[in-house]
A protein has these predicted regions:
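Active-site cores that bind ATP or allylic diphosphates and position pyrophosphate for catalysis
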Residues: 98, 102-104, 110, 147-308, ...
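Conserved short loop/turn motifs at secondary-structure junctions
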Residues: 66-71, 99-107, 129-139, 162, ...
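A glycine-rich helix N-cap at a beta->alpha junction
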Residues: 112-135, 154
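Extended, domain-scale alpha-helical bundle/helix-rich regions
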Residues: 319-412
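N-terminal catalytic cores of NTP/NDP-binding nucleotidyl/phosphoryl-transfer enzymes
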Residues: 41-51, 55-117, 234-265
């Protein structure tokens, strides 16, 4: 810009122009524009399953995204958000719940609740009135547990957690029944109510489902439903001295909310038997269908929430939203748009088997989106003065440059032009390196939108 008050760095160069008024602007056309499905979208088997149900007459569709508020969401969660909320758009009247599975108060905080809500909205989705917490259902879950105790399907175990683990057996060996497995219903009810009243220390008792200690499915070998944990909850305070385990709270929360499809990642595939068992014992009408899909694994990228927490706690990064982090907040600070993330997830697809996705696919989606949406602006970081010797000293004109050559609606901007300009020092070499095609003595280059220049001489201070 000829009128900018910039420092003049040496060396200075003097250049001779050619055909100043006859030069055409250089344009760039992006490969594609954002929005809608990409031409190279990958298969989505969950979408196909749900669509088949709709085609067969399903009239009700309730999805849910159930994060635990113990950290910031990363790009793997973004895939789950997009999958669930997009499915809820397939049927009029359908919706997707945002439910916080807040059953482990030791690691949860309202900061994470707020950040998760911000990320979901930023990705372009709304839950409306359908925001819930597992803690909303603590009393209902407790009452359901009482029903299982009365039905002889749950009991209070007074073994240590270590003894319970050892008694589970293995894939090749049946489990060992707890010596407290055959307690009477009355004794179990009395102990469970005393657990609720806070009369016992942590580790004194747990409530276990009474299923089958010889089952080939280890999850069905009398899993723990409740443990004593005297830690204040971010919503309920000290009201509850015990908390439900994930496998107990999750499925029943789905049922309470009327969820039709519980979409989760493959690590929960071996939880499905227990998920269904609880629903059957409680007599849930039209129980949710659990469907598992492959989680997102990116090359050269850590997506373990526990590992990311260590980076934050140790001060290796400035926070969960550090631009180097693979969190949604970090990507947002890096300048990534929600359209780019949605396009990336669309190309990855939803598969049944775990695999690694090359991180270059994410980078390509980001570049493609930026190319289609970013205005073309120019700046000089390390200025080098250019004097156009055969241009009138007192003349000044302007050239119109497209803000985005691939998007006419983006408009244009006027770029001033005069005898003295500034280019970046990186664009000039007095002795050019191999394959250097920018400014050097005797070489001809084009100024974007303006003219051709040839370096005539170099003047040094």
């Amino acid at each position: 810009h000829p009128r900018m008050d910039l420092p003049i760095w040496t060396p200075a160069t003097t250049l001779v122009p050619h055909r100043v008024l006859a030069c055409a602007p250089v344009s760039e056309t992006p490969k594609s524009a954002p929005g809608g499905k990409s031409e190279d979208s990958a298969p989505n088997f969950v979408d196909e399953l749900v669509q088949a149900e709709i085609d067969a007459g399903r009239t009700r569709l309730v999805m849910r995204f159930p994060p635990e508020p113990n950290g910031y969401l990363h790009i793997g969660h973004a895939k789950s958000i997009i999958t669930n909320f997009s499915l809820a758009q397939k049927l009029p009247g359908a919706h997707c719940n945002l439910r916080f599975d807040d059953t482990n108060p030791a690691n949860e905080d309202t900061e994470f609740v707020e950040s998760i809500q911000e990320d979901v909205r930023w990705l372009g989705f709304e839950w409306g009135e359908h925001r819930y917490f597992a803690s909303d259902y603590f009393q209902q879950l407790y009452d359901m547990a009482i029903r299982l105790i009365v039905a002889g399907k749950a009991y209070v175990d007074s073994q240590s957690l270590e003894a319970i683990r050892d008694g589970r057996g293995s894939f090749h060996q049946a489990g060992v029944a707890s010596p407290f497995r055959d307690r009477s219903v009355d004794e179990n009810l009395a102990l469970f109510r005393r657990m609720r009243a806070g009369e016992f220390d942590e580790g004194a008792h747990v409530l276990r489902a009474k299923i089958d200690m010889a089952s080939k499915d280890l999850k069905l070998r009398d899993p723990v439903m409740y443990r004593i944990l005297k830690v204040p909850h971010h919503r309920t305070g000290t009201e509850w001295p015990m908390y439900p385990m994930y496998d107990w709270a999750h499925g029943q929360s789905d049922a309470i909310e009327g969820v039709t499809h519980s979409i989760c990642t493959l690590e929960f595939q071996n939880h499905r038997g227990l998920y269904d068992w609880f629903q059957e014992q409680l007599g849930v009408v039209d129980p949710p269908r659990q469907i598992e899909f492959a989680r997102l694994n990116l090359t050269y990228t850590v997506l373990s929430k526990r590992s990311l927490q260590k980076l934050v706690a140790a001060g290796h990064v400035s926070g969960w939203d550090d631009p180097r982090m693979p969190t949604v907040a970090g990507l947002r600070r890096r300048g990534v748009s929600p359209d780019a993330i949605r396009a990336f997830c669309d190309r990855v697809g939803v598969a049944k088997r775990d695999s690694f996705v090359d991180v270059t696919l994410l980078e390509h989606a980001i570049r493609e989106d930026l190319n289609a949406t970013s205005p073309r602006l120019m700046g000089v970081l390390r200025p080098l003065r250019v004097v156009i010797e055969n241009y009138p000293e007192d003349a000044e004109e302007s050239f119109d440059l497209a803000l985005n050559p691939g998007d006419e609606a983006a408009g244009s901007r006027a770029v001033p032009f005069c005898r003295e300009l500034f280019v970046d020092q990186e664009d000039f070499m007095e002795v050019p390196a191999p394959k250097f095609w920018r400014l050097f003595p005797g070489n001809e280059v084009r100024l974007r939108g303006a003219c051709l220049l040839t370096v005539n001489r170099v003047v040094k201070n």
